[in-house]
Curated annotation (Swiss-Prot):
Pathway(s) served: One-carbon metabolism; formaldehyde assimilation via RuMP pathway; D-fructose 6-phosphate from D-ribulose 5-phosphate and formaldehyde: step 1/2
UniProt protein name: 3-hexulose-6-phosphate synthase
Catalytic reaction annotation: D-ribulose 5-phosphate + formaldehyde = D-arabino-hex-3-ulose 6-phosphate
EC number(s) reported in the record: 4.1.2.43
Keyword annotations from UniProtKB, A to Z: Carbohydrate metabolism, Lyase, One-carbon metabolism
SUPFAM superfamilies listed in its UniProt record: Ribulose-phoshate binding barrel (SSF51366)
NCBIfam families given in the database record: RuMP_HxlA
Alphabetical list of Pfam families matching this protein: OMPdecase (PF00215)
Gene3D superfamilies: Aldolase class I
Organism of this sequence: Methylomonas aminofaciens
GO molecular function: 3-dehydro-L-gulonate-6-phosphate decarboxylase activity; hexulose-6-phosphate synthase activity; orotidine-5'-phosphate decarboxylase activity
SUBUNIT field: Homodimer.
Family: Belongs to the HPS/KGPDC family. HPS subfamily.
UniProt-listed GO biological process terms: 'de novo' pyrimidine nucleobase biosynthetic process; formaldehyde assimilation via ribulose monophosphate cycle; L-ascorbic acid catabolic process; one-carbon metabolic process
Amino acid sequence: MALTQMALDSLDFDATVALAEKVAPHVDILEIGTPCIKHNGIKLLETLRAKFPNNKILVDLKTMDAGFYEAEPFYKAGADITTVLGVADLGTIKGVIDAANKYGKKAQIDLINVGDKAARTKEVAKLGAHIIGVHTGLDQQAAGQTPFADLATVTGLNLGLEVSVAGGVKPATVAQVKDAGATIIVAGAAIYGAADPAAAAAEITGLAK
């Protein structure tokens, strides 16, 4: 069984809240995407936290420096998970992990553009990372890349960490990523691009369970 996560990627504050209202009953985790949080700020997190107390909320900060300093306000405001880039300095990554631990929350290390994903996963596991994010970005997807080979690499390490997979996941690939060991399955366009986002979210969650 895997958890499902919906990526909220719109820059429009009200549209983001409206979409969250449709999909929140059908997913486990609401993700505030990087452009979305940069554009709308911590107020959006506070709004979603108040409206959706039963969902986990991930804020995709993609922290690259000043780990503890950047992440702490978001944990304090109600984030359950924030992200830090795997290409960041280990001290930065440790700072985000420390901030998460201070609030009883989780830090996700995003492996986007990490060269040796197995080696970095082992390093951050030693630091106490909670979740590894296997992430094929939008620009990489446009070039035809997928996260599936990298997912197999990371889950094959058997480090006991949660593993999130993002990048072009749709109903037809949910079984594949679940069988490959993903514990969190992230869908964005497959939900928000659907004619009925609530139904699309429910379908993906049904396949993930």
